[in-house]
């Protein structure tokens, strides 16, 4: 996972970032597994061309039918036919000649597997003793993560200095991920997490999106080494050098260097990712790419917003700190602070986060309407404060600057295009 942070050519070092490693004591959540008895002879399977199986995975019942094993030669071939059903579960043949089913979800409440006899209908039930022998299968229940939580760790790590992105090697169940996301949302951090279950996009992804927890970026990736996938995703997302020109990027269609595309994706999962605000990593015509969706905001928007906030904080603090005398509580003093903000905004126009030539698409929230629209279109931003002469006496006594309000227009990013061609003979 650590090596993945530096594998892509564009990584956190490109964005002038560093890695802070903070150890903590915790256990991983585990997956539920179901393992058959040893199957030494697959000849019984070879006679099956109409196999059926009822299996409930993470609370979702699946009734498989029409399974044809006539061409199989090994136990691995049996597994291939089961895998081809594209269930949201990992299936493998073990070294002990057993078939092992592993839920892709985590934790006692979310990760479950139940195999049972199929009632009614034609076909050969693979639950039977001559096949999977479901009655003797061994189930190992999933467990929840324990120990220090990510929220507790972040509070401790902040003593070392500021950090933006957060990754954890800990495997977390949905409830813990949601708790982490809720805690991080109130802070100046971005939490990168991955779910191995594609169906979990409609559960965990929906929960995070509906709660407006957009500082949590959820990648759904069902292949092996999912933690490597999210680390690679996170380092590319953190690679923007906001001091440059045209350096802002979108995660859409980016290649995750060293990560295989998810072969289990289909149109249903694509639609689920789009609806539930998750990103996925697939392949189109042999090209591996991230497919990024905005139901929970786009990742580049969240990273740029945080970079802008921290840049404004530093710039305006520096005005106060680097002034040898004082900033007067007059219009000229307010202008000095506004000019510092404007310099930051101009840089974010240059780096591509803020766009010009665009119109404000909602009711004007403050200031002079005509000036507001003109500034947004020409500059990409509008900076406003009420005249200091109108400031309340209590604020003057507290030596507070009048509220400085900033509106800006995102530059956005084109992710797709429609083309109509008119042909005349």
Predicted ranges, named:
Residues 1, 291-425:
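Structured, hydrophobic secondary-structure cores that serve as assembly/anchoring elements
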Residues 131, 148-149, 261-266, 330, ...:
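Helix N-terminus capping/helix-initiation residues
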